[in-house]
Amino acid sequence: MQNRVAALLLDGHPDLAARAGADGSHLCGIEALGNAIATLKPARIAGCGGLETRHEAMVAAEAGADYVMCGDPDTRGDRPAFEAIAQRVAWWAEVFEIPCVGFAATLDEVEPLDAAGADFIAMGDCVFGAGHGAAAAVADAARRLAIAETVA
């Protein structure tokens, strides 16, 4: 995928990511990251979400995560208030060099996450559950980011 300026990450399954030639895995929590690092590194990306505290994010970074994710839903689909997510992204971007991925639950969250300093924006149901199609939702997000860039 990288020849198309995109990375293909599997949700977990580091062994499958390596066998299938994916670029890496997104792992949920420090334990999953620790279990997967040897399988993925150094050839593949090991990203980490499911981090409930700033401390957990720092531990993930120290353990070798290539990025940390803020705002991803837990197994029940719950996540912190968006304001708390944006604050965590801003704090991370100011203090650390390891990239931060902000999770946008809606297209309206894309611009504020970018403004907060997210290096990347992850989107879930707002793209894949969009009534007007995933391609249109991604194009909408890109337009929002382009607008944010021209205003900044």
Enumerate the predicted regions with their spans.
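Short beta-strand/loop segments at the ligand-binding rim of alpha/beta enzyme cores
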Residues: 1-9, 38-49, 93-103, 151
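N-terminal active-site wall of soluble small-molecule enzyme domains
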Residues: 1-42, 86
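Glycine- and other small-residue-rich loops at beta-strand/loop junctions that grip anionic moieties
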Residues: 6, 25, 49, 78-81, ...
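Catalytic cores of alpha/beta
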Residues: 8-23, 52-64, 95, 99-123, ...
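Glycine-rich phosphate-binding active-site loops on the catalytic face of alpha/beta enzymes
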Residues: 29-36, 67-79, 114-144
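Histidine/lysine/aspartate-rich catalytic loop segments that bind and position anionic ligands
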Residues: 46-80
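Charged helix-capping and loop-helix junction motifs
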Residues: 81-89, 137
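Extended, intrinsically disordered, low-complexity segments
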Residues: 146-152
